[in-house]
Amino acid sequence: MLCFVAHQKNNRIYDYLFIGITVILSFICFSNRELFMKLAFIPYRTIRNHEYYRIVTHGFIHADMTHLLVNMFTFWSFGLYIERTFRYMGFGSGAYLALYFGGMIVASLYDLIKRRNDPYYVSIGASGAVSAVLFTSIFLDPWGKILFFAVLPVPGIVFGLLYLAYCQYMA
């Protein structure tokens, strides 16, 4: 057990990497509309111009500070648990990366099909990837507590429902 605990100090590498890239790109895109439109998920352009990179890049930019903070706080709150659990279960970092990027990609597929003929539809944010991490955590420990607004302990399943409501409101 001591080896497992000592090894956990470095478990956040992907969390910090994803958060760092997302924060930096989001801040740049807050003031650079051209880059924002180049990275955003626009199904019409994705299909017509074969710009499939957009299925991933849109997950690293956000509309505003609130959008960025909610997604990154949620990811940070649940990411460590999933990264540790996956390593403990022998899945390793590859499974964690697959979960994150898989969530991002799968969440985009519906809009890719439904909105492929709409040149004005634009989607951004890491909600698909964050939802994959969040709901994997809830699946593994539905009653685990998270400090909502850093003070109110709520079960993960309740936080998940609140996060879904927020995502729906922002959509």
Task: Name every feature range the model reports, one short phrase each.
Residues M1-A171:
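A detector for small-residue-rich transmembrane helices and their helix-helix packing motifs
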